[in-house]
UniProtKB/Swiss-Prot annotation:
It comes from Coxiella burnetii (strain RSA 493 / Nine Mile phase I). Pfam families: Ribosomal_L1. One of its GO terms (molecular function) is structural constituent of ribosome. Belongs to the universal ribosomal protein uL1 family. Coiled coil: none annotated. Part of the 50S ribosomal subunit. PROSITE patterns: RIBOSOMAL_L1. One of its GO terms (biological process) is regulation of translation. The keyword Zinc-finger does not apply. This is Large ribosomal subunit protein uL1. The keyword tRNA-binding applies. The lineage of its organism: Bacteria, Pseudomonadati, Pseudomonadota, Gammaproteobacteria, Legionellales. One of its GO terms (cellular component) is cytosolic large ribosomal subunit.
């Protein structure tokens, strides 16, 4: 059975020409056809940017609320006090606290995907940098997770906000949905992310900014996107 599945996957993967770029709509269709794993694969994008990643003023970091969500169930923890505690809970936060939440995190209990904090609680959150930082959970105003509007931040996280940043090679990796999404939904999610990354272009960046766009499913082949079909 396994050999049969492998052969089928190979046949599907052969549909993808490695040296060809595809219009976005065609790339998404191919990815869905090639994704034959027994689980609902994620669909990921890799965006190679024409920046000097060694320079801090060209590093890109941000967040996009995908119009159709990411397909993930997101658990949100919020550092808040006063009225913001109830606001966070009403917006759907899973965990809300301050010193008690900090103690929980220091004890290794990190059962959440996003951490949001109000500015005045950063005196507590700042001490957790060595724990939250390596996990990509440290609140940051650049991605809207340090904010006075905790209700909106929680709702955004729950509705499918994705965070992104350039790696050391100037590449952004991000998930835009799941294989079971409608093709149109994946296309709109991709374009929402791409538009935000375009807006974030550093003034110091020279030459072609969006150098290469690649889509893939968790277990599938990478498919290069024709940049002219997405206004890149």
């Amino acid at each position: 059975m396994a050999a049969k599945l492998t052969k089928k996957r190979k046949t599907l993967a052969e549909k993808v020409q490695r040296d060809k770029t595809y219009p976005l709509s065609e790339a998404i269709k191919l990815i869905k056809e090639c994704a034959k794993a027994k689980f609902n694969e994620s669909i990921d994008v890799a965006i190679n940017l024409g920046i000097d990643s060694r320079k801090s003023d060209q590093a890109i970091r941000g967040a996009t609320v995908l119009p159709h969500g990411s397909g993930r169930t997101v658990k949100v923890a919020v550092f808040a006090q006063g009225d913001n505690v109830e606001k966070a809970k009403a917006a759907g936060a899973d965990i809300v606290g301050l010193d008690d939440l900090a103690e929980r995190i220091q004890g290794g209990d990190i059962d959440f995907d996003v951490v949001i904090a109000t500015p005045e609680t950063m005196r507590v959150v700042g001490k957790l940098g060595q724990v939250l930082g390596p996990r990509g959970l440290m609140p940051n105003p650049k991605v809207g997770t340090v904010t006075t509007d905790v209700a909106s931040a929680v709702k955004n996280a729950k509705q499918g906000q994705v965070r992104y940043r350039t790696d050391k090679n100037g590449i952004i990796h991000c998930t835009i949905g799941k294989v079971n999404f409608e093709e149109k939904a994946l296309e709109e999610n991709f374009l929402a992310l791409l538009n935000d990354i375009k807006k974030a272009k550093p003034s110091a960046a020279k030459g072609t900014y969006l150098k290469k766009l690649t889509l893939s499913s968790t277990m599938g082949p990478g498919i290069a996107i024709d940049r002219t079909t997405v206004g890149a």
